[in-house]
Amino acid sequence: MASMAAVLTWALALLSAFSATQARKGFWDYFSQTSGDKGRVEQIHQQKMAREPATLKDSLEQDLNNMNKFLEKLRPLSGSEAPRLPQDPVGMRRQLQEELEEVKARLQPYMAEAHELVGWNLEGLRQQLKPYTMDLMEQVALRVQELQEQLRVVGEDTKAQLLGGVDEAWALLQGLQSRVVHHTGRFKELFHPYAESLVSGIGRHVQELHRSVAPHAPASPARLSRCVQVLSRKLTLKAKALHARIQQNLDQLREELSRAFAGTGTEEGAGPDPQMLSEEVRQRLQAFRQDTYLQIAAFTRAIDQETEEVQQQLAPPPPGHSAFAPEFQQTDSGKVLSKLQARLDDLWEDITHSLHDQGHSHLGDP
């Protein structure tokens, strides 16, 4: 029942958010057409008041039954003919809004609870993936330090070679170029398992999320499964893209360092300046590390963003929350209508599933 209540509360809140958009007139006209005349609405209201429930559960079941009929009329939001307005559309709309607010006030606590529980599980996923990104950053720092040590050109021995003559300088630079190729290749080999671990960790922990969030999400099992699969696919693709970008960074670093050790100046009879060469190496390595850190940080932010979107889809916050229905604050009424249609389709699926389960539950009662 709590799951169904959260779904219904979101439906009511969604309608409230939608009524503030540029397309609200068409929506209410459509409702006026499909809901029949005013007398029928008043009759439903009088029946509802006459059967005032003694408990919250009875009240919720009655509201759910009424909303099931109400939502059937919300399915088609486009393609209808010109609406036929009732005699008093303003009064009907006011009465409907009052009833919606009454039901929403009763059910809102369930929505807040579901939002909190789903959010807690998604935060658990973020914390589970954090060590993987920390490992990536630690590996970058470690391998950059290793490259720095292998490409030192300011020691006494290397300085003497660079300044000793063209042949000696050329031999040293060729050796440094070989080190660049070797150690950047080694970097790739050592980094690969960590990137693969991130991908496999995403798949494993998202499946754990699926199991842990299922008891709390108002969404139907089918929609929950779709949301989880989309989340897993998105994060996996982003993790693979991150690995590819780091590989590209390494290729670029190898090319830049190889050019730096190309022996500029040896053809003129003088070797390169050791201090200048060392500074260039340092700058190249620092730029590589900084760029890679930024890309890993961007991936971490993407995890936060994707999980927040899943929370909005599975258990949106109650009305009044700062994150409530941000997509409906746009000025483009066409986009708002499209998103509202998609959201109502999701709600319809969830409500149908919940009512189906509720019906089976009643059939099983002695």
Curated annotation (Swiss-Prot):
<dbReference type="InterPro" id="IPR050163">
    <property type="entry name" value="Apolipoprotein_A1/A4/E"/>
</dbReference>
<dbReference type="GO" id="GO:0005615">
    <property type="term" value="C:extracellular space"/>
</dbReference>
<keyword id="KW-0345">HDL</keyword>
<dbReference type="InterPro" id="IPR000074">
    <property type="entry name" value="ApoA_E"/>
</dbReference>
<dbReference type="GO" id="GO:0005770">
    <property type="term" value="C:late endosome"/>
</dbReference>
<dbReference type="GO" id="GO:0033344">
    <property type="term" value="P:cholesterol efflux"/>
</dbReference>
<keyword id="KW-0732">Signal</keyword>
<dbReference type="GO" id="GO:0033700">
    <property type="term" value="P:phospholipid efflux"/>
</dbReference>
<dbReference type="GO" id="GO:0005769">
    <property type="term" value="C:early endosome"/>
</dbReference>
<dbReference type="GO" id="GO:0008203">
    <property type="term" value="P:cholesterol metabolic process"/>
</dbReference>
<comment type="function">
    <text>Minor apolipoprotein mainly associated with HDL and to a lesser extent with VLDL. May also be associated with chylomicrons. Important determinant of plasma triglyceride (TG) levels by both being a potent stimulator of apo-CII lipoprotein lipase (LPL) TG hydrolysis and an inhibitor of the hepatic VLDL-TG production rate (without affecting the VLDL-apoB production rate). Activates poorly lecithin:cholesterol acyltransferase (LCAT) and does not enhance efflux of cholesterol from macrophages. Binds heparin.</text>
</comment>
<dbReference type="GO" id="GO:0010898">
    <property type="term" value="P:positive regulation of triglyceride catabolic process"/>
</dbReference>
<dbReference type="GO" id="GO:0050750">
    <property type="term" value="F:low-density lipoprotein particle receptor binding"/>
</dbReference>
<dbReference type="GO" id="GO:0005543">
    <property type="term" value="F:phospholipid binding"/>
</dbReference>
<keyword id="KW-0175">Coiled coil</keyword>
<dbReference type="GO" id="GO:0060230">
    <property type="term" value="F:lipoprotein lipase activator activity"/>
</dbReference>
<dbReference type="GO" id="GO:0006869">
    <property type="term" value="P:lipid transport"/>
</dbReference>
<dbReference type="Pfam" id="PF01442">
    <property type="entry name" value="Apolipoprotein"/>
</dbReference>
<dbReference type="GO" id="GO:1903561">
    <property type="term" value="C:extracellular vesicle"/>
</dbReference>
<dbReference type="GO" id="GO:0042632">
    <property type="term" value="P:cholesterol homeostasis"/>
</dbReference>
<protein>
    <recommendedName>
        <fullName>Apolipoprotein A-V</fullName>
    </recommendedName>
</protein>
<feature type="modified residue" description="Phosphothreonine; by FAM20C">
    <location>
        <position position="55"/>
    </location>
</feature>
<dbReference type="GO" id="GO:0050996">
    <property type="term" value="P:positive regulation of lipid catabolic process"/>
</dbReference>
<dbReference type="GO" id="GO:0070328">
    <property type="term" value="P:triglyceride homeostasis"/>
</dbReference>
<feature type="modified residue" description="Phosphoserine">
    <location>
        <position position="59"/>
    </location>
</feature>
<dbReference type="GO" id="GO:0005794">
    <property type="term" value="C:Golgi apparatus"/>
</dbReference>
<dbReference type="GO" id="GO:0042157">
    <property type="term" value="P:lipoprotein metabolic process"/>
</dbReference>
<keyword id="KW-0964">Secreted</keyword>
<dbReference type="GO" id="GO:0008201">
    <property type="term" value="F:heparin binding"/>
</dbReference>
<dbReference type="GO" id="GO:0060229">
    <property type="term" value="F:lipase activator activity"/>
</dbReference>
<dbReference type="GO" id="GO:0070325">
    <property type="term" value="F:lipoprotein particle receptor binding"/>
</dbReference>
<feature type="coiled-coil region">
    <location>
        <begin position="54"/>
        <end position="157"/>
    </location>
</feature>
<comment type="subunit">
    <text>Interacts with GPIHBP1. Interacts with SORL1; this interaction leads to APOA5 internalization and sorting either to lysosomes and degradation, or to the trans-Golgi network.</text>
</comment>
<keyword id="KW-0225">Disease variant</keyword>
<dbReference type="GO" id="GO:0005788">
    <property type="term" value="C:endoplasmic reticulum lumen"/>
</dbReference>
<dbReference type="GO" id="GO:0010902">
    <property type="term" value="P:positive regulation of very-low-density lipoprotein particle remodeling"/>
</dbReference>
<dbReference type="GO" id="GO:0055090">
    <property type="term" value="P:acylglycerol homeostasis"/>
</dbReference>
<dbReference type="GO" id="GO:0006641">
    <property type="term" value="P:triglyceride metabolic process"/>
</dbReference>
<dbReference type="GO" id="GO:0031210">
    <property type="term" value="F:phosphatidylcholine binding"/>
</dbReference>
<dbReference type="GO" id="GO:0019433">
    <property type="term" value="P:triglyceride catabolic process"/>
</dbReference>
<dbReference type="GO" id="GO:0034364">
    <property type="term" value="C:high-density lipoprotein particle"/>
</dbReference>
<keyword id="KW-0967">Endosome</keyword>
